[in-house]
Curated annotation (Swiss-Prot):
Annotated source species: Arabidopsis thaliana
Name the record gives this protein: Zinc transporter 11
Protein's UniProt keywords contain Cytoplasm: no
This protein's UniProt keywords: Cell membrane, Ion transport, Membrane, Signal, Transmembrane, Transmembrane helix, Transport, Zinc, Zinc transport
One of the record's GO molecular function terms: metal ion transmembrane transporter activity
Reported function: Probably mediates zinc uptake from the rhizosphere.
Subcellular location, record wording: Cell membrane
Any Pfam family hit: Zip
Family (UniProt): Belongs to the ZIP transporter (TC 2.A.5) family.
GO biological process: zinc ion transport
Topological domains annotated Cytoplasmic: 71-75, 143-174, 225-235, 284-305
Membrane topology: Multi-pass membrane protein
CC terms in the record's Gene Ontology section: nucleus; plasma membrane
Extracellular side: 21-49, 97-121, 196-203, 257-262
């Protein structure tokens, strides 16, 4: 077996125990408290969210600057990105969308009735809205970048160097991905900030952090190729910006929970989780699965069958985790 595959599965062995701790460790506490509002505002829950804020920042920042000091396996990044995409997709559909739909049904069901009225799929509609809003943000960023490139050409940019033009295109894609992921990360962080229980917060933490670790490593490698003059300064700057985006979202989510009560908190939770579902689906499908990580040299695992197995493994992991969530 290639070294990249060994490294990849070793990483998974280290991550899965963290998943078990996050999902099962606080389950008894969740069942002991039947009053959602008190758990939502409890000091222990807020402490967990603050811990998540710090953890996601530190791990993302370290991952972002790591390519400057370490030489990551190309195969590991190819499979890791696909695995993260499977985790993101399964989390959005099996966890976020399910919880949002259940909350909407509870809010819209009158006392003494068994079915909501009206029986409109609000969670699914808002998930579509989150997907489209994220796509719109990507389109705006792409338009701004393409306009900048056209302006440079009109100012007399040398068109004879085709290799340089190809390089600039790949650089533009990398910058677009970085900016878009920073935008997405704010909303991903909100998913942690508005978590109803400590186990939900830990679960959202490991899911988002797993994705951000691979994204940060890939971002760091792209920056080393793009800006060779000051690679360390660039890595630190961009890694800090990317790492701080999710904690900002966590802080926003904590403020939302701390300033709302009763059904208002439930409405905000349902709305935010529905929109976050759309964001997660877009990021997983468009950025992680469709584009993925493009190695600068041929690697053995950069083939459809290996990518499919990595995505399948990510989905299966979430499917197993959801056994303890139901």
């Amino acid at each position: 077996m290639s070294r990249s595959l060994v490294f990849f599965f070793l990483f998974l062995v280290l991550v899965v125990p963290c998943l078990s701790h996050g999902t099962g460790g606080d389950h008894d506490d969740d069942e002991a408290s039947h009053v959602k509002s008190s758990d939502l505002k409890s000091k222990s829950l807020i402490s967990v969210k603050i811990a998540c804020l710090v953890i996601i920042f530190v791990l993302t920042f370290i991952s972002g600057v790591s390519p400057y000091f370490l030489k990551w396996s190309q195969g590991f990044l190819v499979l890791g990105t696909q695995f993260a995409g499977g985790v993101f997709l399964a989390t959005a559909l099996m966890h976020f969308l399910s919880d949002a739909d259940e909350t909407f049904r509870g809010l819209l069901t009158a006392e003494g009735e068994s079915e909501p009225s009206p029986a409109y799929p609000f969670a699914y509609m808002l998930a579509c809205a989150g997907f489209m809003l994220t796509m719109l943000a990507d389109s705006v960023i792409a338009h701004i970048y393409s306009k900048t490139q056209n302006d440079l050409e009109l100012q007399g940019e040398d068109k004879s160097n085709q290799r340089s033009a190809t390089t600039e295109t790949s650089i533009g894609d990398s910058i677009l991905l970085i900016v878009a992921l920073c935008f997405h990360s704010v909303f991903e962080g909100i998913a942690i900030g508005i978590s109803e229980t400590k186990s939900d917060a830990w679960r959202a933490l490991w899911t988002i952090t797993l994705h951000k670790i691979f994204a940060a490593i890939a971002m760091g490698i792209a920056l080393l190729r793009m800006i060779p003059d000051r690679p360390l300064f660039s890595s630190i700057t961009y890694s800090f910006a990317f790492a701080i985006s999710s904690p900002i979202g966590v802080a926003i989510g904590i403020v939302i929970d701390a300033t709302t009560q009763g059904s208002i908190a439930d409405w905000i939770f349902a709305l935010s989780m529905s929109l976050a579902c759309g964001v997660f689906v877009y990021v997983s499908v468009n950025h992680l699965l469709a584009k993925g990580y493009r190695p600068n040299k041929k690697v053995h695992v950069d083939e459809p069958r290996y990518k499919f197995l990595a995505v399948l493994f990510g989905v299966v992991v979430i499917a197993i985790v959801m056994i303890w969530d139901t």
